[in-house]
Amino acid sequence: MEFGLLSEAEARSPALSLSDAGTPHPQLPEHGCKGQEHSDSEKASASLPGGSPEDGSLKKKQRRQRTHFTSQQLQELEATFQRNRYPDMSTREEIAVWTNLTEARVRVWFKNRRAKWRKRERSQQAELCKGSFAAPLGGLVPPYEEVYPGYSYGNWPPKALAPPLAAKTFPFAFNSVNVGPLASQPVFSPPSSIAASMVPSAAAAPGTVPGPGALQGLGGGPPGLAPAAVSSGAVSCPYASAAAAAAAAASSPYVYRDPCNSSLASLRLKAKQHASFSYPAVHGPPPAANLSPCQYAVERPV
């Protein structure tokens, strides 16, 4: 009888159940299982390719759209960038009002524009450094004519020898009176080899004086030596050629001289010119070979 009453009570209240000892055990609510089943169904629907588009758009990453600036906006932004590369918040807001853009867009544009400006500055500095080191590394040393345009390889000897003495002025003048002392004691005289080379030309034409062109060719003669003075010396002195040669040797570019060699050369030159100098002989009838000494004295014209 009691067992039947208990079974009826269990049937009426299914939430309670008695064990063998008579202790009740609460049962789990059914709505919890239903919520878990609902969440599992949502995950399955989201994982399936044919799920709802709203659930897929939430999980996808939002893509940023590129801003396309008009020519008026770019002109205004560039003009402001030339004045101020780091605008503050208020300036950016004013620019945004002028250009019909948002402050965030203006801030991003200035950031990108500064990055481009720095990149251009670095590239220009690299080009300048490369250009400055290209010449020493590529050609090692630039050509000599480019570094020193006033000096060339062809005109070194004339500049080294002729101009220093040709431009020098002497306090005395050359004439027929003082040519002799200058010939005996020249101020500048060449070595014996050069003096010996001038001997044949002087001995070949005794009594003649080389012209001013010849004197300039020998040693770039001094400007004080006039042609008239040389010609007058040639007429008055039989050794005018030797004096002229010695005077030409005096203007030679050799500063250092050997007095012994110069004096010997001048003495040899004078001796050769004196030997070549001779008076014209009187031409008469040849003496007869058979005449006696007395007849030869009578027959010879007086």
Swiss-Prot record:
Biased composition (Basic and acidic residues): 31-43
Name of the protein described by the UniProt record: Pituitary homeobox 3
Top-level taxon: Eukaryota
Tissue: Highly expressed in developing eye lens.
Main location: nucleus
Molecular function as annotated in GO: DNA-binding transcription activator activity, RNA polymerase II-specific; DNA-binding transcription factor activity, RNA polymerase II-specific; RNA polymerase II cis-regulatory region sequence-specific DNA binding; sequence-specific double-stranded DNA binding
Pfam families in the cross-refs: Homeodomain, OAR
Subcellular location: Nucleus
Modified residue annotations for Phosphoserine: 52, 57
Gene Ontology, cellular component aspect: chromatin; nucleus
Task of the protein: Transcriptional regulator which is important for the differentiation and maintenance of meso-diencephalic dopaminergic (mdDA) neurons during development. In addition to its importance during development, it also has roles in the long-term survival and maintenance of the mdDA neurons. Activates NR4A2/NURR1-mediated transcription of genes such as SLC6A3, SLC18A2, TH and DRD2 which are essential for development of mdDA neurons.
Start-end of DNA-binding region: 62-121
Gene3D superfamilies, alphabetized: Homeodomain-like
SMART domains membership: HOX
Record motif OAR, residues: 262-275
Region spans: Disordered: 1-71
